[in-house]
Amino acid sequence: RKTQWTLQKNTGLDFIPSNDFSFYDMTLDTAVLFNIIPERYTKLGLSALDTYFAMARGYQGAAGDVKALAMKKWFNTNYHYMVPEIDDNTEIKLAGTNPFDEFAEAKALGITTKPVIIGAFTLLKLLRYVGKKQATDYADAVSAAYAGLLEKFVAAGAEWVQFDEPYLVHDLTSEDIALFETLYQGILAKKGPGKVLLQTYFGDVRDCYGNITALAFDGIGLDFLEGRKTKELVEANGFPQDKVLFAGLVNGKNIWKNNYGKTLEVIDALKAKNINVVLNTSCSLLHVPYTLKNETKLPEKYTEHFAFAEEKLQELAELKKLADVDYKLDTAFLENTSLFATRPDCRNNAVQERVAAIREEDFTRLPVFKEREAIQKKEFALPVF
């Protein structure tokens, strides 16, 4: 943790996250933090850490035999998360100290971090409900628990606290939006002098843009890369002058270098609207490799186009400097522009020619399905089962 915090500080980042370390999974960490632990695991009578790993990996031993929680894909990534279970008897409350311990650990190093935690709405939407109660039945308890967490962070000296709400990029019902508003009206009422960042990613918030900008968040993080309508939403609806826009413009999911020209064009457009902008990654960098320093066997003609996690931090720092100057004559900008102007491996002329030659009839598959089905049945003669 010390290494990562120090790296980010030395790179020049203004907002350094904490509570992003996990023994196994951040969703599981959040569930445990709020006492969402199924009874079959607590009945084992194990230590807190062993109970955590029993939920993550299962347990077979003297205390009993239980399977791990189910696993699902984390939205549209190849990362998987543990699906927390909640039953009707679960008492949701702030039960853990790990996020506060890490904040204090970083503060002792002279680094005031921005604690990051999965938000109340996303947590409720990802839970597996095994009783009669549903998400709305837990709204008051969850809101109170998160409000308590926020108050504790502010008391500890946190300037910003980030709540990750990727579920907001899904298609939302009016009931979903009402639940989100109920949760955060309670949470934000307790923020005091602290500042709260609502962070979204993996898409745009077209179903709730007006709702989230109307709430008392101090910052809102939007994905300008996977969010197809993000730019349009900001242009059409504006952005509150009393909030900070954390613009996700450095891709947190792929390995490619950032096109500075395209990124700075968006930043310039936002600044022209007098929007207070902070340059951000589109999502967490856990989805990309760690650093290019370890890629000693790849030719430079490939690596010069790559940016892994460490390199993306450097891109953030470099783009921050460029955004505040007349960058079009800056050496870093010109080098980046030159790189993108001479990327021979990204264009295959033969493929371009084939695409250009596509005709309307090429989209019709022949023979028709019934004929293909008859041919396949005759050819393979597969049994019914």
Show where each model-derived region lies.
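Domain-level signal for soluble alpha/beta catalytic cores
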Residues: R1-F385
